[in-house]
Structures are given as structure tokens and as C-alpha cells.
């Protein structure tokens, strides 16, 4: 890979022996290893990788003569002393050598044929037509001279000695240097790596739009890739692959590589599917009658990109197939075939080139052949038979489309040529070159096209029969049928033109023969000479057979495809042209076989019917899928609506049940609270009556003693001082005893009252810890109900699917936080203290009950007081008789007044906490009516809000579940 010499890394086996004839054990270990040449200089250019266009065939001569080896030794070409015993040459099969000789002979005969055509054209052209038809023949003469100069230059270049180089192994290498004028024949598929400079613009009469050419080129590339894919699969299935025992690491690597290949192929198929879908949508949007140029070019560029993606997917598929062998392939090959079918149909809809339908038909046939071949790949004996049957079923377009393909791929030239994959594929390509040469230099008015083609093929193939017979005996029939079919269709569309009519580029319509062949010429003008191979041997003999005259001429049948665009105005004009007398005279001269015509027509009709059936079946399946989709969406919407109705009814029923339970609970609470208050009041009064009786008795006893003392004090005012001291002591003792008794009584009364109150509260808490017979408690309960309603509303609005356990935990936490009861507090106990000793013990006691403004009913209080005053007087003697041995207490008037005041206030407190009905004032009726109104209003508002919320929730769920999913 040096700058001035080619890469010459010699790889060979180098066994060595010792002098005694025995093998060296160290050498035996490495004799089967590859020995690389280390004489290559360590230059930076040798480490770089260079890519270039494929070179010509490189042939190295064998070193069998002593002179050559001696010459090489003198020229210092031999690198090492051990290279004399090694034999270094390029191994070329006999088939490739014979094929190269055949191509050289064909090129020589082609040049002879061009000279013959030119001489015949110059002799047959009269002087008058040279003056009148100068414009007509000006361009062909220029082309002839240009081609002649190119052919002469090619001959001179071919006769010049090739460049001789000597490799490091000592062998002579003849390198072929191509002529610079022929560089325009090859158009590689790779993008340009440099600026090509100014290119001559193609003429409008000779070339179509660039986008159409690119689309046609991509379709033909896909066709060629399909054919190569089929050949490779055939080769793989024909070989008997033996399963070798692999290491676990190797098996793991193979498995990982296959998984990566499967993932990559899946991504490629997905991208290709999306591209096909976008192209189909764009084609559906485009009108078949009026299509803007920008939209059409955009669609064609996308179609070409999709074709390139399909080619890459095919190459990956073939790689996986050859890697896996007999392992089962995934089902993506069928999907790839369907995508290629859709791409082909899109190409037919979009392209106006008449050669596209033929290529598409061949692609569809190849896809069917590929699928059937993959289905039977496990039985290699049946593969060849199946494929031959499929090719016999579809004889139209297979070879014809292959011969339209210009071989421009560098990979195809680098691939080694063998008889299996070269000859059957390349045998039908020379027909294009023959037609082009015949139509360029032959006047339109000499002979009918069929006879002209026969004569040209006779001249060209007369000398090739003996040379190429063993290669192509089985390919002549299909070639002959296709050549005649092309001649018939183009002779039928041909418009009569005289010699004197000048040729115009844009204004007039050229003959159908020239324009039809120019369309084919654009797809074939870049075909290299190394790929245009003539291998049909029996064509001339078969074309010389007598043909029956054609009685009627039929226009080619157009398949009734509703989705394909209508024919162009030029094609429509050609179809409507009436037959002229000149055409009538030419009809008896055109000869063809009725059986072959019927066979071709039947095959074309069969293929057109199959395409129409495929379109109808595709539209039918799409319609069925749309109907199924609509039905499924309707059923899903119906199910969702039914579920929403059922859920709404269930929620409403639950709310009604909760409302009824709450009302019943409130009623029970009101009844139980009333009974509880009555019981507490009765129990408190039962415990307080004995204490009140005792207090009244003590009061009455004290008053009697005071009266007696006053009377005795008047009579005995001048008694002894010792008696006064005894009386004072006795009075102080009585006061002390009374204070102790009152303290004990007050403490017992306070304990009993609090025990009753706490017992009532405990009982109410046991029944319902949250409910009490107070109005504020009911208001608090209503607030709790509103909070619960708000939580329900938030739950419906948020649509949060939380855990029910979390809800229960939150409710338990709320229940633990009990509301602070604002009950009226009980009065503090009376603290009775001793009064200050007064000097004058005489006190006027007023036995009257003081008026209390806070009392609810004074009349009731006075009546109760009179009853309490009268009762102790009656039972005072009985109590004194029953309780003998106890000292009576004498209470002063102030203390008695305080005791009475305390009793009245205590009764008022009991009346407040018991909610006793006093006159027309009944607090329980008011509280019950107020609570019922509040509950009714709250429940009505909650029900209305819940109804609105359920409707909003249903609408939101329907929108999110169905409308968004449908769009």
C-alpha cells in the first residue's frame, strides 16, 4: 500500500524441514499457521484504509520460464532468498477467463457492426434528403462521429500494452488502465466525494425529470437486490450445512449477535413501515388529475428513500439467513414482503414511466418466489423444482426487467463471478444494446421494425452461435419472446413519419419507436461494457422462422386499477391515432406467432387481473378493519357508559342510605338525651332531699333556741356572769359544730352532683362520643358532616385511587381528635368560714327567702320555699324524737341566708343543664326543629352538589377514556 506500489502482503504456508530430513518440532507446531510478509515498509500510508472504484480484472502470469525469473533477479524485484521456491499468482477460474475472452470478442464485433451500420446509412442516404433533412440527420451524425471517435480511442487503448508492475512476490502483474473518455459509463451508487464540476445539462427531448429517473433507478435497484437475494438463498439451501459443536462462549456470542440482528431488523422494518404509511397517506391526498410538481417531487423523493430502506432491509435479511442457515427465521420476512409490495404499488401509482409497471410486476413475482422458497427451505431437494415452477408461471418481465438494470454497484463488480450466479442473470441484457444501435443509425422508412430487428440480430449473432453455444442453450426462448413483444408494442404505437419531415426537439412528437427507446436508453446509458454480455446463441436462428401475418392490431390492455393515475395526454393521443395507408401496407410485413401472442396476452391479462384482485382485496380488508374498529369503539363506549351509570346509581343509593341512617341516629340521640336528663334530675333530687331536710331541721332548731334565749335574757338580764360565759361557750361550740356539719354536707353534695354529672356524660359518651343534648354539639356535628361531604367531593374531583386502609387510618385519627365540649361548668363548692366574733351576739334573724333575679320562675321558687319551710316544722318533733343524743345546731341568720342562696343557685344550675320545659319555653322542641331544618338543608345541598359532581366526573371520564383515545 505504498505510494508507488500496490499492496503485496503474501499469505502462504511455509513448511520447513531440517537437513537430516526430519521435521523440526517447533516448525510442526506453526506450519499450519498463516505467514505474513514482514518486508512491507512501516509507512503511515500502509496503515490507512483506502476505498476506490473496482479495477479491471488483474491477471498475473505464472513463473514457469527461467528467463523471466532471471530478469526479475537482475531487476532486484525479489525481496528475499526464500521466494524462489514459492509460487505466487492470482487464481482465476477457467469460467472467468473464458468469459473475459468472450467479452473482448463481443466488443470487437460491436465495433464492426457500428462501422457496418454507418457505411450502410451513408450509402442509402440520397443527396436530396441530405439537403432537406439536414436538421434531421445532423444530430445522429454528430452522435455517430462522437461514438466512432470513442470506439477508435477505445480500440487504440485496447491495443496499447497494459501497464506492467511487479509485485513483491516476483510475479508480473498487467494492470488495465481505463480510458478517461469512458469514465462516464459508470455511475456508482455511493455519494460523490469531491466536486464533479460543471456537468452538461441533459436535453429535454432525451431525458425526463431527475426525480422520475431517481425513482426508476431505485425501483430497478430493488429489483436487482431481490434477484440477488433469491440467488443467495438458493445457494444456501443447496449447500449441506453441518452443525459443528461450539464452545459455550461461542454459542453465547452467536446468540447475542442474533438477538442484536433481530432488534436491528425490527427497527428497520418499523421505520420502513412508517415511511410506507406516510407515502400512502400522501398519495391518497394527491389528486390523480392535478398534481403540483413540488408535492410530486417530494413524494417521489420519499418513495426513493423508502426503496433504499427496503434494499437495506433485504441485505440484512440475506445476511441473517446465511448466518442462521437452517435455523428458523422470524416472521418478519413476510412483513418485509408485504411492505415491498406496497412500495411497488405506490411506485406504479406515482410514476408515469411506462417501464415502471414491468419492473413492479417482476418485483411482485420475485417476492412470491422468495416467500415460497423460504417456506420450503427445510427441504433443499424441492427448492429448485419449486422456483423453476414459479418462474415458468410468470414468464413476463423477469428477464426483461433484469436487462433494463444498469449494473453500477461497486459491490457487484467486486463479487467473484461464477457460472451459477452470472450467466443465467446476464444472458438477456444484450437485447438493449442491439435495439439502441439499430434505432440510432437506421432510418425510420426502411423496413418494419420487426424485420429490421431480425436482420440486425442476424448480423450480430451469426458469429456468436458457435462460440457461446454451451452457455446459453436454455435462455433463448424467453429472450426471443421478449424482443418480439417489445417490437410489436412499439410498432403498434408508431406514428407514420416521412423522411422529409425535420426533427424538432420540443414542438413535435418523435416517432414512438425513438421515444420509447430513449426512455429505455436513460436507464441503460450508464451500463459498463464489462456488464453487457451477449450470451444468446440461438436467437438469430429462431428469429428467421416464418411468421404468420398479423390481421388485426390490438392496443395493449390496461388493467382496470381505480387507484392508478390516468394515462398521459401523449399516450392517449397515440392510442387514438387511426391507421394510415402506410401502416396498412406495413401490417402484412410484420410477422409473429399467434400462439406466442396469445400466450403473452394471456399472461399479461392474468397478471393485470391478479393486480386488480390484490387492489380489491386490499381495499376490502381495509374496509373490514375500519368497520371492526368502529364497532369496537362503540362497544367500548357503551360499556363505559353502562359502568358509569351503574357506579352513579350505586353512589346515589349509598348516599341515601347514609342520609337515612343519620336521621335515625339523630332521632335516637334526641330521645335518649331527654330520658337521660330526666333520670339525672331525679337522681340528684333524691340525693339532695335528705340533706335539705337536715338543713331545715337545723335551721328551725336554731331559731327556736334563739327565741328562747331572747326571752330568758330579758328575764335574767342580771344573772350571774358565769352563766353568760357558759352560754357564750355553748354558742361558740354550736357554731363550730354547725360549720363542720355544713362543710361535710357541702362536700358530700358536691361529690354526689359531680358523680351524677360525670355518670351522665360517661353514659352519653358510651352511646355516642360525639353527640350530646347540647345545641352547640349538634352544630359541631353538622360541621363534621360538611367536612365529610367536602372530602367526598374532593375524592370525586381528584379521582385519586388511594388505599382504603389509608382512608380508615385517617378516619380513626379524626375520631381520636374529640371536639372540645363547651358545657356550662358546675358552680364551685361553698366555702363556709367562721365569722368574726362580735361583741353583741344579739342578731335579728329574718326568715325570708331573698329574691333572685336569675331564677327562671319566681312563683315556682316561692312555692317550693314555702313547702320546704312547712315540711321541717311538721317533722321537727319527730326528728328530735328519732334522733335523740345528738346536739342541735343553731345557725345565725347570715349563714342561713347563704345556705338558702346556695340552694336556689344550685336548683337554677340543675334546671339549666337538664333543659327542663318551663312554661311555653321548651328548648328540646326548638333544638329538634332547628336540627331537622339544618339536616334537610345540608342533605339537599349535598345531594345537589353530588349530582353535579357525578355528572362532571362522568363527562370527564368519558372524555379522557374515549374521545382522546379515539382521536
From Swiss-Prot:
The modification Phosphoserine is found at residues 287, 409, 700, 826. Residues 885-967 are annotated as: Necessary and sufficient for CEP20-binding. Disulfide bonds: none annotated. Residues 179-188, 525-543 have a biased composition (Polar residues). Pfam families: MNR. One of its GO terms (molecular function) is metal ion binding. It comes from the Eukaryota. It is found in: Cytoplasm, Cytoskeleton, Microtubule organizing center, Centrosome, Centriole; Cytoplasm, Cytoskeleton, Microtubule organizing center, Centrosome, Centriolar satellite; Cytoplasm, Cytoskeleton, Microtubule organizing center, Centrosome. Residues 557-568 have a biased composition (Pro residues). Keywords: 2Fe-2S, Ciliopathy, Coiled coil, Cytoplasm, Cytoskeleton, Disease variant, Iron, Iron-sulfur, Joubert syndrome, Metal-binding, Phosphoprotein. Residues 616-642 form a coiled coil. Residues 178-201, 401-431, 490-601, 849-872 are annotated as: Disordered. One of its GO terms (biological process) is cilium assembly. One of its GO terms (cellular component) is microtubule organizing center. Its main location: cytoplasm. Involved in centriole duplication. Positively regulates CEP63 centrosomal localization. Required for WDR62 centrosomal localization and promotes the centrosomal localization of CDK2. May play a role in cilium assembly. It is linked to Orofaciodigital syndrome 15: A form of orofaciodigital syndrome, a group of heterogeneous disorders characterized by malformations of the oral cavity, face and digits, and associated phenotypic abnormalities that lead to the delineation of various subtypes. OFD15 features include facial dysmorphism, lobulated tongue, clefting of the alveolar ridges, left hand postaxial polydactyly, broad right hallux and left hallux duplication, and intermittent respiratory difficulty. Brain anomalies include vermis hypoplasia with molar tooth sign, agenesis of corpus callosum, and ventricular dilation. Interacts with CEP63. Interacts with WDR62. Forms a complex with OFD1 and CEP20/FOR20. Interacts with PCM1. This is Protein moonraker. The lineage of its organism: Eukaryota, Metazoa, Chordata, Craniata, Vertebrata.
Amino acid at each position: 500500500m505504498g505510494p508507488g506500489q500496490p499492496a503485496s502482503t503474501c499469505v502462504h504456508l511455509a513448511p520447513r524441514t531440517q537437513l537430516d530430513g526430519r521435521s523440526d518440532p517447533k516448525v510442526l507446531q506453526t506450519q499450519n499457521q498463516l505467514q505474513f510478509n514482514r518486508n512491507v515498509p512501516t509507512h503511515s500510508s500502509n496503515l490507512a484504509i483506502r476505498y476506490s472504484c473496482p479495477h479491471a480484472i488483474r491477471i498475473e502470469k505464472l513463473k514457469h520460464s527461467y528467463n523471466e525469473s532471471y530478469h526479475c533477479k537482475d531487476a532486484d524485484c525479489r525481496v528475499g532468498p526464500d521466494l524462489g521456491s514459492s509460487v505466487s499468482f492470482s487464481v482465476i477460474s477457467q469460467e472467468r477467463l473464458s468469459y473475459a475472452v468472450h467479452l473482448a470478442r463481443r466488443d470487437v464485433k460491436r465495433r464492426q457492426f457500428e462501422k457496418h451500420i454507418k457505411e450502410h446509412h451513408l450509402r442509402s442516404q440520397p443527396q436530396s434528403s441530405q439537403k432537406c433533412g439536414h436538421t434531421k440527420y445532423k444530430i445522429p451524425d454528430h452522435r455517430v462521429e462522437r461514438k466512432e471517435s470513442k470506439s477508435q480511442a477505445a480500440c487504440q487503448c485496447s491495443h496499447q500494452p497494459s501497464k506492467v508492475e511487479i509485485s513483491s512476490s516476483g510475479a508480473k502483474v498487467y494492470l488495465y488502465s481505463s480510458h478517461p473518455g469512458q469514465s462516464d459509463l459508470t455511475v456508482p451508487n455511493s455519494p460523490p466525494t469531491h466536486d464533479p464540476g460543471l456537468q452538461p445539462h441533459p436535453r429535454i427531448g432525451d431525458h425526463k425529470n431527475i426525480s422520475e429517473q431517481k425513482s426508476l433507478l431505485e425501483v430497478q435497484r430493488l429489483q436487482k437486490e431481490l434477484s440477488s437475494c433469491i440467488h443467495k438463498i438458493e445457494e444456501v439451501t443447496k449447500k449441506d450445512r453441518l452443525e459443528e459443536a461450539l464452545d459455550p462462549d461461542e454459542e453465547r456470542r452467536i446468540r447475542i449477535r442474533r438477538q442484536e440482528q433481530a432488534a436491528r431488523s425490527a427497527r428497520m422494518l418499523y421505520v420502513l413501515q412508517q415511511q410506507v404509511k406516510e407515502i400512502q397517506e400522501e398519495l391518497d391526498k394527491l389528486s390523480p388529475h392535478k398534481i403540483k410538481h413540488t408535492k410530486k417531487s417530494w413524494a417521489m423523493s420519499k418513495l426513493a428513500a423508502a426503496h433504499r430502506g427496503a434494499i437495506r432491509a433485504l441485505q440484512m435479511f440475506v445476511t441473517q439467513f446465511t448466518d442462521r442457515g437452517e435455523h428458523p427465521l422470524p416472521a418478519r420476512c413476510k412483513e418485509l414482503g408485504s411492505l415491498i409490495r406496497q412500495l411497488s404499488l405506490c411506485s406504479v401509482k406515482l410514476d408515469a414511466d411506462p417501464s415502471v409497471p414491468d419492473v413492479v410486476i417482476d418485483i411482485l413475482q420475485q417476492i412470491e418466489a422468495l416467500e415460497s422458497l423460504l417456506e420450503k427451505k427445510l427441504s433443499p431437494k424441492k427448492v429448485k423444482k419449486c422456483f423453476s415452477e414459479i418462474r415458468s408461471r410468470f414468464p413476463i418481465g423477469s428477464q426483461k426487467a433484469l436487462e433494463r438494470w444498469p449494473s453500477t454497484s461497486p459491490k457487484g463488480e467486486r463479487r467473484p463471478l461464477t457460472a451459477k450466479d452470472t450467466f443465467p442473470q446476464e444472458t438477456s441484457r444484450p437485447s438493449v444494446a442491439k435495439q439502441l444501435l439499430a434505432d440510432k443509425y437506421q432510418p425510420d422508412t426502411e423496413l418494419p421494425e420487426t424485420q429490421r430487428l431480425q436482420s440486425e440480430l442476424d448480423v450480430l449473432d451469426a458469429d456468436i452461435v458457435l462460440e457461446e453455444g454451451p452457455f446459453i442453450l436454455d435462455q433463448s426462448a424467453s429472450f426471443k419472446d421478449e424482443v418480439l413483444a417489445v417490437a410489436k408494442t412499439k410498432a403498434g404505437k408508431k406514428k407514420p413519419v416521412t423522411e422529409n419531415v425535420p426533427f424538432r426537439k420540443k414542438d413535435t412528437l418523435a416517432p414512438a419507436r425513438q421515444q420509447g427507446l430513449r426512455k429505455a436508453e436513460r436507464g441503460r446509458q450508464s451500463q459498463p461494457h464489462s456488464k453487457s454480455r451477449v450470451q444468446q446463441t440461438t436467437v438469430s436462428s429462431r428469429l428467421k422462422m416464418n411468421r404468420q401475418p398479423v390481421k388485426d392490431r390490438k392496443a395493449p390492455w390496461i388493467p382496470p386499477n381505480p387507484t392508478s393515475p390516468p394515462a398521459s395526454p401523449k399516450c392517449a393521443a397515440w392510442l387514438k391515432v387511426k391507421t394510415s395507408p402506410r401502416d396498412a401496407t406495413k401490417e402484412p410485413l410484420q410477422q409473429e406467432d399467434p400462439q406466442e401472442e396469445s400466450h403473452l396476452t394471456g399472461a399479461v391479462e392474468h397478471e393485470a387481473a391478479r393486480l386488480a384482485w390484490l387492489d380489491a382485496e386490499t381495499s376490502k380488508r381495509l374496509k373490514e378493519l375500519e368497520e371492526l374498529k368502529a364497532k369496537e369503539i362503540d362497544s367500548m363506549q357503551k360499556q363505559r357508559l353502562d359502568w358509569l351509570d351503574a357506579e352513579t346509581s350505586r353512589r346515589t343509593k349509598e348516599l341515601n342510605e347514609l342520609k337515612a341512617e343519620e336521621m335515625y341516629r339523630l332521632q335516637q340521640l334526641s330521645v335518649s338525651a331527654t330520658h337521660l336528663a330526666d333520670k339525672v334530675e331525679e337522681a340528684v333530687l333524691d340525693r339532695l332531699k335528705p340533706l335539705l331536710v337536715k338543713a331545715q331541721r337545723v335551721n328551725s332548731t336554731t331559731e327556736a333556741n334563739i327565741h328562747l334565749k331572747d326571752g330568758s335574757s330579758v328575764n335574767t338580764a342580771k344573772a350571774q356572769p358565769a352563766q353568760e360565759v357558759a352560754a357564750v361557750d355553748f354558742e361558740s361550740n354550736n357554731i363550730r359544730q354547725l360549720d363542720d356539719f355544713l362543710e361535710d354536707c357541702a362536700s358530700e353534695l358536691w361529690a354526689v352532683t359531680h358523680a351524677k354529672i360525670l355518670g351522665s356524660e360517661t353514659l352519653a359518651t358510651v352511646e355516642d362520643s360525639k353527640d350530646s343534648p347540647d345545641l352547640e354539639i349538634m352544630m359541631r356535628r353538622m360541621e363534621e358532616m360538611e367536612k365529610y361531604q367536602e372530602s367526598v367531593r374532593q375524592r370525586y374531583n381528584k379521582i385519586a385511587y388511594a388505599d382504603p386502609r389509608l382512608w380508615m387510618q385517617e378516619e380513626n385519627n379524626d375520631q381520636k381528635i374529640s371536639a372540645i365540649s363547651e358545657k356550662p361548668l358546675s358552680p364551685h363548692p361553698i366555702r363556709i368560714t367562721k365569722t368574726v366574733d362580735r361583741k353583741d351576739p344579739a342578731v335579728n334573724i329574718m326568715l325570708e327567702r331573698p329574691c333572685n333575679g336569675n331564677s327562671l320562675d319566681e312563683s315556682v321558687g316561692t312555692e317550693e320555699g314555702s313547702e320546704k319551710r312547712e315540711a321541717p316544722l311538721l317533722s321537727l318533733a319527730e326528728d328530735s324524737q328519732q334522733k335523740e343524743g345528738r346536739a342541735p345546731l343553731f345557725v345565725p341568720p347570715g349563714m342561713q341566708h347563704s345556705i338558702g342562696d346556695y340552694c336556689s343557685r344550685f336548683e337554677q344550675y340543675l334546671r339549666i343543664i337538664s333543659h327542663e320545659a318551663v312554661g311555653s319555653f321548651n328548648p328540646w322542641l326548638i333544638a329538634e326543629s332547628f336540627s331537622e331544618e339544618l339536616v334537610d338543608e345540608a342533605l339537599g345541598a349535598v345531594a345537589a352538589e353530588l349530582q353535579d359532581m357525578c355528572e362532571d366526573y362522568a363527562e370527564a371520564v368519558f372524555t379522557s377514556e374515549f374521545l382522546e383515545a379515539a382521536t
